[in-house]
Curated annotation (Swiss-Prot):
Pathway: Nucleotide-sugar biosynthesis; UDP-N-acetyl-alpha-D-glucosamine biosynthesis; N-acetyl-alpha-D-glucosamine 1-phosphate from alpha-D-glucosamine 6-phosphate (route II): step 2/2; Nucleotide-sugar biosynthesis; UDP-N-acetyl-alpha-D-glucosamine biosynthesis; UDP-N-acetyl-alpha-D-glucosamine from N-acetyl-alpha-D-glucosamine 1-phosphate: step 1/1; Bacterial outer membrane biogenesis; LPS lipid A biosynthesis. One of its GO terms (cellular component) is membrane. Pfam families: Hexapep, NTP_transferase. This is Bifunctional protein GlmU. Binds 1 Mg(2+) ion per subunit. UDP-N-acetyl-alpha-D-glucosamine binds at residues 9-12, 23, 73, 78-79, 140, 155, 170, 228, 333, 351, 366, 377. Residues 252-459 are annotated as: N-acetyltransferase. Its main location: cytoplasm. Its cofactor is Mg(2+). In the N-terminal section; belongs to the N-acetylglucosamine-1-phosphate uridyltransferase family. In the C-terminal section; belongs to the transferase hexapeptide repeat family. Residues 1-230 are annotated as: Pyrophosphorylase. The active site is at residue 363. It comes from Bacillus thuringiensis subsp. konkukian (strain 97-27).
């Protein structure tokens, strides 16, 4: 196999997005558009990848890191001009170069591989990825000669009446013989309505020089959708969401209502897990097998063990063990580690806490900056008082501890193994192992007080 290279065009300003965020960094199913493209082209066995950047270059470089080299298009003068900015990296290389736009997040490695194979089998100097659509307005048209070969590509704004009737369109993805590509770029003119240097003109240049120009017509037009505004962004989101949901269902995940379930592109979900409506799985979340998630649950960048149930709750940047029960209406905040067979009940908030195996906080509790041992019971209304207005402090609760209802543990404080804390206590000192700590005022009953009070009011 000959050397393979790729150029991703990501220098457009994206003015139609009307956004401060660089266009190709707008997310689709939780991942920036350009990252989707990079992830797919990286499966093609490339020797070099060059991303052409312009406005917002630093943000794109930060997103992609060292998986790509970068070339700067300081002034946007057209797609041919953009590709030419990669000459310093690629111009002298032997091989095949794929050119693709960074705002086409739906393109797949399979389609690009088919394009490359067509290019090789045809012995072509250039091959165009095309599609046939009923409403081609706005797209460049593929003009073929009497032999069916690609003669040229005409931009919509420059097309005559006959050319506008053509329904085979240019998707904006190509592959070229690398040296032929860079040799032809200097011959491209900007003599057109827009005054720009069009990459499709390279096709006509190569054809006029007697080279073979081939085309691969994809059946999956939706893969070629370019995102230039918020409407197209929403369309891409829907298509990608459906693709991700279908992939998970094929792999054994039950999604009760796919139209109302959102899964990020990088999430991994085990078989026989059930997702109820309103479930949102974000980021690099990993969910085990035989889980039940939702309804109306958000999980972000977290790891969920097998046979765990999460209902109407939120989990962020945390790790949950196996056979955990969460919710309804619980909130597990970042940097929490929840052990196996744990119960986190309704209106319980856990933050930056290690919560041991088989421990329970079943109702109305806040556990923050804490280390909770195994087999602990936190009664309704248990609170770790971790903040003094300036600093956060740690609470340590040992194994087998029982915390009575409506108790406050004022950190820094330790409740040692096997200790009991009486209901209604405010604990400000360490509790020894197996001790009972009572920290509340003694009850006083005043006999006949109510009658005396009422009689006093009457007099």
């Amino acid at each position: 196999m000959s050397n393979r290279f790729a150029v991703i065009l990501a220098a457009g300003k994206g003015t139609r997005m009307k956004s401060k965020l660089y266009k190709v960094l707008h997310p689709v199913c939780g991942k920036p558009m350009v990252q989707h493209v990079v992830d797919q082209v990286s499966q093609l066995g490339l020797q070099k990848l060059v991303t052409v950047v312009g406005h917002g270059a630093e943000m794109v470089q930060e997103q992609l890191g060292n998986v790509s080299e970068f070339a700067l298009q300081a002034e946007q003068l057209g797609t041919a001009h953009a590709v030419d900015q990669a000459a310093g990296v690629l111009a002298n290389e032997e091989g095949t170069t794929l050119v693709i736009c960074g705002d086409t997040p739906l393109i797949t490695a399979e389609t690009m591989e088919a394009l490359l194979q067509q290019h090789k089998e045809a012995g072509a100097m250039a091959t165009v990825l095309t599609a046939y659509i009923e409403e081609p307005a706005g797209y460049g048209r593929i003009v073929r000669n009497e032999n069916g070969h690609v003669e040229k590509i005409v931009e919509h704004k420059d097309a005559n009446e006959k050319e506008l009737a053509i329904k085979e369109i240019n998707t904006g993805t190509y592959c070229f013989d690398n040296k032929a590509l860079f040799a032809s770029l200097s011959k491209v003119s900007n003599d057109n309505v827009q005054g720009e240097y069009y990459l499709p003109d390279v096709i006509e240049i190569l054809k006029n020089e007697g080279h073979i120009v081939s085309a691969y017509q994809t059946e999956h037009f939706d893969e070629t959708l370019g995102v230039n505004d918020r409407v197209a962004l929403s369309q891409a989101e829907i298509i990608m969401k459906n693709r991700i949901n279908r992939k998970n269902m094929v792999n054994g995940v039950t999604i009760i209502d796919p139209s109302n379930t959102y899964i990020s592109a990088d999430a991994i979900i085990g078989s026989d897990t059930v997702l109820h409506p309103g479930t949102i799985i974000e980021g690099n979340t990993v969910i085990g097998s035989d889980c039940e998630i939702g309804p109306h649950t958000v999980i972000r960048d977290s790891e969920i063990g097998d046979r765990t149930i999460i209902r109407q709750s939120t989990v962020h940047d945390s790790k949950l063990g196996t056979e955990v029960s969460v919710g309804p209406f619980a909130h597990i905040r970042p940097d929490s580690v929840i052990g196996d067979e744990v119960r986190v009940g309704n209106f319980v908030e856990i933050k930056k806490t290690v919560f041991g195996n088989r421990s329970k906080a079943s109702h109305l509790s806040y556990i923050g900056d804490a280390q909770v041992g195994e087999d602990v019971n936190l009664g309704c209304g248990s609170i770790t008082v971790n903040y003094d207005g300036k600093n956060k402090f740690k609470t340590v609760i040992g194994n087998g501890v029982f915390i009575g209802c409506n108790s406050n543990l004022v950190a820094p404080v330790t409740v040692e193994d096997g200790a009991y804390v009486a209901a209604g206590s405010t604990i400000t000192e360490n509790v020894p192992s197996k001790a009972l700590s009572v920290a509340r005022a003694r009850q006083v009953n005043k006999e006949d007080y109510v009658d005396q009070l009422l009689n006093k009011k009457k007099s």
